[in-house]
Amino acid sequence: MLRYVYFNGFGMRQGLLKRCSSHILRRSYSSDIRNIGILAHIDAGKTTTTERMLFYAGKTRSLGEVHRGNTVTDYLTQERERGITICSSAVTFPWNGKRINLLDTPGHIDFTMEVEQSLHAVDGVIVVLDATAGVEAQTMTVWSQADKHRLPRLVFVNKMDRPDADFNKCVEDLKSKLETFPVCIQYPAKSNEGQLGIYDVITLEQLNWQQKDLGRSYSKLKLEPSDGLRQLQDKRNELIDQLSGLDDELADVVISTESFDKVSNELVNKALRRVICQQKAVPVLLGSAYKNIGIQCLMDAVNHYLPAPEERNEIYNCFGNELAGKVFKIVHDKQRGPLTLVRVMRGELKRGMRLTCSSGQAEVISKLYEPLADEYREVSVVSSGDVALCAGLKSTVTGDLLTSSQSSLKNAEKRFKQQRHSDGMSEEEDDDEDHHLDGLFDLAPQIPDAVYFCSIEPPSISSQTAMEQALRQLQREDPSLRVSYDSITGQTVLGGMGELHMDIIKSRILSEYKIDVDLGPLQIAYKETIEAPSLTTLSVEKEIAGTKQNVSITLELVKNQSEIFSLDKSPENLQNLNKLRPRIVQVLRKGSISALERGPRVGGQVVDTQIRLHNAIIGRGTADAFIMATAAQCVQKLLSENGTRLLEPIMALQIVAPSERVSSIMADLSRRRAIINDVLPKGDRNKLILINAPLAELPGYASTLRTISSGTASMTMQPCGFSNMNSSDESLAIRRAQGLE
């Protein structure tokens, strides 16, 4: 139910959530906790910003630097070697009376799943922008993920010390590309020497950082009229005007006062907090993490403006004082084994406590830790609203809801249902809720489709078991890693989100498990679709263990992008279908759909196809497994006899290159079946090229681009759908999939 009401915004109206949570037994807990995530495009400065936060909060004694490989949050060997974040990491630190639990997330598109998991555990986010680039491709991706979870957010415009930084462009990008309402509470103040300071719009002060003590201290200078005070006052008036249009309480104050100057800073801050928590506006701050400027103000903004745990997740109030914990990540520690990261929604987690996970398995917490990336401090209890690492949980998986017992979960469901009825819910709402009752608190992550596949082989037969164990652990940690067994080739097959993702998996198996596995050539994850509708009847009769098994089924495949399975409601078939028990229909549905997982051309998933059941005659005593297998055979027969067409994945590329290199880059792209959508100016010397190109034409393209541009161009790439192929490209793809090219 949570997936539909709260996180994804589907299902029942928000009003229902408010009605229920206002009556159900409430749990009070500390409002001094802030659970936040930090999101950005790759290389915008997320990890550097996080490292500065830890340093100024007193958690670290030296500044961690990405280029030196000594950061706290990027602790994997691969992260330090490559200078990128691969796995989300949790850190806890105090700041001005508040306790901040921060999750640093990856910026590369291959690790979007890490971001998705982390957002289940936070109450607000910081979105970091590169001041020289504005809103970039992955910024838009993570922003839409935050929208899905309805998370309040702050924007931090980083790298403002750079000569080519453009604060105004970043603000315009927020409006045009993200369709949000930015309110600037800071503006850049650059000295004649180029030293970056910050104008505080609310207090009308100029803030200047001291570099002698690594930015630990900064001065506040009250502006005089000669220092541009009038211009800053105009900005403050503009801010108040914007907020009063969004907040009724502030609007009433503005109407009753003579001028904006009479509106106190306290009233402005309170109004700002309300509109942020209601997601009516996004405050914009600025600084330079690398130059140690603006980080303290950013942490103050987290404390002042982002919501406390009790202001979110009201739906969990049905648990009262009982435990409700949300599993959002699992990591493997060499000494401690699997460690489960849990956001405690209600109740308390205690060392030695018995738990029940979503599968119904009983678990016992052997030890509890406070997170600090890959270092942990043992604690005995973790309260509501906080984040903990649990050791000893063996059956729990990402997305589970942890409760103190099955009866506790049932009582919470009962309490919630009672409240729904006492609130006078309509029949339509009631039916919708009952439909999802089995998954009332299901938080299983939505795993994106794999982009690449490849085989994986151990160095020797004796290493096979160890490799399979390593893959199980990595898959538990990273749900976007797909592991399957190909019965035709007898190989283990990996599915991943990109070349980098697969490369990292191989590297981690070597460095963490000491197994030098061999990866086969990367195969594109093509999909297949039918060319025309087709209809067939399959009758199968066998005797198994002395029992006669008899199934006759008529199925049709038609083009459809919405519903994957349906019943033919025509008069000649309706009478027969109405006689089928719902359980038999579900068995037929499950068997039919399973056959779409592997198409006849290259084994790709069959999409944009609907299975329509026309008729089914099931003999008495026929086993469900036999019915399911017959349905799958019928679909496979239709696909094999009538054929499918390939659909190839298309990637959206954004390339930034010097103007003089654009023609050579575009000439190379034209040979790769690319479609150039636009070429836009990017600063004074660069161009931004927007391209759609088939993934099959882009293996190793990052290296090619570096060669063509002599290392001056950069690119980002993300999936943007699938497209039909012409016959020659399709034939080439099939030969490549068969290893003939």
From Swiss-Prot:
Binding site for GTP: 40-47, 104-108, 158-161
SMART domains, per database record: EFG_C
Key words, A-Z: GTP-binding, Mitochondrion, Nucleotide-binding, Protein biosynthesis, Transit peptide
Domain tr-type G: 31-310
Stretches for region Disordered: 408-436
Pfam families in alphabetical order: EF-G_D2, EFG_C, EFG_III, GTP_EFTU
Biased composition (Basic and acidic residues): 411-424
Main location group: mitochondrion
GO MF: GTP binding; GTPase activity
Localisation: Mitochondrion
Transit peptide (residue range): 1-29
GO terms, biological process: mitochondrial translation; ribosome disassembly
GO cellular component, one term: mitochondrion
Protein family (similarity comment): Belongs to the TRAFAC class translation factor GTPase superfamily. Classic translation factor GTPase family. EF-G/EF-2 subfamily.
Role according to the record: Mitochondrial GTPase that mediates the disassembly of ribosomes from messenger RNA at the termination of mitochondrial protein biosynthesis. Not involved in the GTP-dependent ribosomal translocation step during translation elongation.
UniProt xrefs under PANTHER family: RIBOSOME-RELEASING FACTOR 2, MITOCHONDRIAL, TRANSLATION ELONGATION FACTOR G-RELATED
Designated name of the protein: Ribosome-releasing factor 2, mitochondrial
